[in-house]
Curated annotation (Swiss-Prot):
One Pfam family linked to the record: Ribosomal_L13
InterPro entries the record matches: Ribosomal_uL13, Ribosomal_uL13_bac-type, Ribosomal_uL13_sf
Chief place where the protein resides: mitochondrion
Protein name: Large ribosomal subunit protein uL13m
Entry keyword set: Mitochondrion, Ribonucleoprotein, Ribosomal protein
Subunit structure: Component of the mitochondrial ribosome large subunit (39S) which comprises a 16S rRNA and about 50 distinct proteins.
Organism, as annotated: Drosophila melanogaster (Fruit fly)
Location within or outside the cell: Mitochondrion
């Protein structure tokens, strides 16, 4: 067996660590991407009864972006198990309490119908910001590409770039913008 084939085989059977930046990403679109790596769907040895998934580290879950008015319309259900223990929490309230919970529930729900999803969720590591412990970062070997590009905010662009940006119209100096 050649060295290249041997390395490819090791990579297939080993658990790889991936990192994913959730900044300005839709958690439900991101959950589909993360699910493929957690379950090992991208590996040639995948089988539903085979536990061949990888570890995924999600950073900046505080910066997720829900589409439209999902923050005020999406409701999460929880039951304590006691009579009258049902509670419904809005997405923005849940995100305020725990910035990782909306993303965690999105990934959990994307694996619907999988009997091993509770065990699989143990390989998901969530962080509200980019402060990740060093022992976890040492294991990371791959970065998952985000489906959306992150737009640059106007207040983060330096003045020199703004002044050199081409103008569509040159207004006269005495023109008043209303």
């Amino acid at each position: 067996m050649s060295i290249a084939k041997r390395v490819q085989q090791w990579a297939t059977f080993a658990r790889t660590w991936h990192i994913y930046d959730c900044t300005w990403q839709n958690p439900f679109e991101s959950a589909k991407l993360v699910k493929t790596h957690l379950l090992g769907l991208q590996k040639p040895i995948y089988h539903p009864m085979n536990d061949c998934g990888d570890h995924v580290v999600l950073i900046n879950t505080r910066e997720i972006a829900l589409p439209g008015d999902e923050w005020v319309k999406r409701v999460y259900f929880h039951h304590t198990g006691y009579p009258g223990g049902a509670s419904w929490t809005l997405a923005w309230q849940l995100h305020e309490k725990d910035p990782t919970m909306v993303m965690k529930k999105a990934v959990y729900n994307s694996m619907r119908g999988n009997l091993q999803r509770r065990h699989t969720m143990q390989r998901l590591h969530l962080f509200a910001d980019d402060q990740v412990p060093e022992e976890i970062l040492q294991n990371v070997t791959n970065q998952i590409r985000t489906p959306r590009s992150i737009p640059q905010r106007l207040d983060h662009i330096d003045k020199e770039t703004l002044e050199n940006f081409p103008n569509i119209m040159d207004y006269p100096k005495d023109y008043i913008l209303r």
